[in-house]
């Protein structure tokens, strides 16, 4: 464990979720991802996702497939990417730290998803497109 913490490639200050991945085929840079990177990435991802949803719901233009449905589908990419990597690592390399992170993150992520899915303004816009 001590050796891993001295590895200059694996420092908590360089959160790989906050940079574009320059890896082959865009795969996650697993050698640079540490457990302490996830909560800040989840928090930023949720914040960005909320801002993207707010942009959809506050759009004064008539609701269309493009500015509502496609925008909703495109929203939350950073959060989705972080959740995907987190899920893969929890399944493949679980340990006490990752399990503790799951216990901490899952209620926050569930509440975030509920907030988005139950957003009255978003529902109205989607219904306008449907009607």
Residue ranges and their predicted role:
Residues 1-5:
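Hydrophobic h-region of N-terminal signal peptides that target proteins for export
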């Amino acid at each position: 464990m001590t050796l891993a913490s001295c590895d200059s490639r694996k420092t908590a200050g360089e959160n790989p979720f906050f940079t574009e991945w320059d890896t082959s085929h865009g795969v996650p840079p697993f050698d640079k991802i540490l457990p302490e990177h996830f909560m800040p990435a989840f928090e930023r991802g949720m914040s960005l996702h909320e801002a993207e949803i707010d942009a959809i719901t506050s759009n004064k233009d008539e609701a269309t497939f493009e500015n509502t449905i496609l925008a909703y589908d495109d929203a939350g990419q950073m959060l989705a990417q972080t959740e995907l990597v987190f899920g893969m690592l929890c399944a493949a390399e679980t340990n006490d730290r990752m399990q503790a992170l799951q216990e901490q993150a899952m209620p926050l992520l569930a509440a975030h998803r509920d907030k988005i899915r139950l957003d009255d303004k978003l529902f109205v816009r989607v219904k306008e497109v449907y009607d």
